[in-house]
């Protein structure tokens, strides 16, 4: 009876192999993380030296194993990978603290990305292995290679050489590993293994796409289809020499090498002759072009035939059945255009080059763009020209991440030989080529940079008008100003009651005898229409001095006119936008260059004469917008108390309570400082001591004190800013026709109580270390001598004192008493609360309000009575 022999089929656990490699890699990572910069640098230097020592042996192995390329050129590649790469990365800080900016309080700390999967091509097997191993270990990352199967032995030999050197120098045993039995399955499992942190991929489109599909932060690069444009201004001999150098280097296997030359018609024949003079063969007949195309490209014409990649021009010509001299270095296919109908205009990775005539510069650029679109987006483009403007235009138009000028593409693209680009054997193609990077990959791409940011206080400031004049008769300063054309902005009352004439008389005593133009149509709560109306007069008159005379409305309107006069392209839409930091605002108002701006207040309230603020009502939506920019700060403020002696009692009360609100809000602002708090406190003290008397008797002392308090409070809030009392007042005052100061008086007690409660949303400002509005209010109460044993009691004492002061000055302290109906309030309150939140003053409030909380404050003030 015959015995049947059953053949044993050997099975191999691919997944188990990958698991083992990954686990060893993770252990190696722990070891590498313990090494310092000096140790890492020593290890990588030893790797470089070891690879350099064996560069010839590895080159020979690569050529013998793959059958592709040129031994001598591969030796140069290996030297480049070990010498140039080491030189480029040797001083890179990749361990621990790599950068510290003590002024900014920023410390950058480098950490390894983790275990890397390195995929290498058959075209540059040993040099790419050396390169990737060195940049991986330089950044303390273990690397596990998946080599191209056709270059497994030479690639593994390169890895073994640098591994042995690394381990001998102190690196962990498994810091460099590789798949010993290569397969598509093994590469896929390695790239997708959970321990693998990133994929460093060099190869064909399919492999790179697989790397990006892993869901890991892959560093893969795309294919090239490099156009080289030789213009009529080019140095022909140099350009042709560069092309020979590039296309014959390792038989054209560097992906950055030129795939077609586009030549201006004027020098087309000269270029051909230069090529022919140096053993190029021009393929121009239809029959030879067809043969070459059949040999070089796959049948569908969409990709190069792998069988010719890296072979000599003579070998490829023989395959194509084209007789060429034995010394032929380069095959040049003369074709008519770029596109699918011209397969030889695609990437060829061999000493085969397409040549296309351009009848104009525009056509030349178009053909280069078409080359990239056909299959080289993001990679490399070359121009040979002495026209520097054209070099820049080429760079702007080409969708390539390496734009090389008067340079051989193969040697230029990898960097640091013909230019100062980062040396690399992995060339990023950016979003054009569906890559995550657009530069040459190096060690900098293989670290996680942790940023340690120390808390800092923003630099603060104290900005005021350069000149502030005060005391009675300080208006006489106008007699000495340098002026030829003075624009006076005021309201009708200033003309009616003689204040405008007072200014005019001072100017008439000025030896410069300035011309004077008056705009006196400013209304309460000035609108953009008023500003634009005044601007027309400004533009016609062209003043070199602007004087704002009156209350806040006149000064604010004048600021708006001044702003637009100085810079007509200023946008009110931009100027009204809210900001978190005045120094970083998205819209910047430019400083004045034409006219000096002088403010002379005739009421004691707004402080606008010393502030960078102007409140303007948009004529389109009837909303008050506080404009804020230090470009709006006046050049001169004249605080002359004689101008406020006849202000009516009701106006004095309203403006005085506005002063109090300025002072209290600036004191508790998140931006309050030692420079502003003293001014705030003194202004508060003056208001409580003199406002009631100023309203009821109008005596000179109290009026002067209140005038000074107004400016002092203005100085404080010009630098510390305000809070939500003003945010709400800006919106409800305009909507309900209530004077601004009176609106603040009604709101302030409720805002104090609200701000003093523990916040639901904390304010954001670095210098504001913790919530302290309650204690700030309590400090004010103590300063005023108010009663209270606890912080809460002192806060309530302050709120009550504010309310009582309002009553004492004749203000009815609720909305209802101002003629507002509940129905009207309910109909508008939601919109007004939102607008108040949007107001610029909200950002400096000691706690961030919710819109619902602003609404509650408004509601509470409707019929409130103490």
Annotate each language-model stretch with its function.
Residues 2-107, 135:
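N-terminal Rossmann-like NAD(P)+-binding subdomain of aldehyde/semialdehyde dehydrogenases
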Residues 5, 12, 130, 208-332, ...:
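ALDH superfamily catalytic-core signature
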Residues 93, 158, 529-642:
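Glycine/threonine-rich beta-strand-loop-alpha-helix active-site module
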Residues 97-238:
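Rossmann-like NAD(P) dinucleotide-binding subdomain of oxidoreductase/dehydrogenase enzymes
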Residues 277, 610-720:
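Carboxylate- and glycine-rich phosphate/diphosphate-binding segment that chelates Mg2+/Mn2+
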Residues 322-458:
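Conserved C-terminal structural/oligomerization subdomain of aldehyde/semialdehyde dehydrogenase
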Residues 459-545, 816:
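ATP/NTP phosphate-donor binding region
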Residues 735-824, 864:
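Gly/Pro-rich interdomain helix-loop hinge
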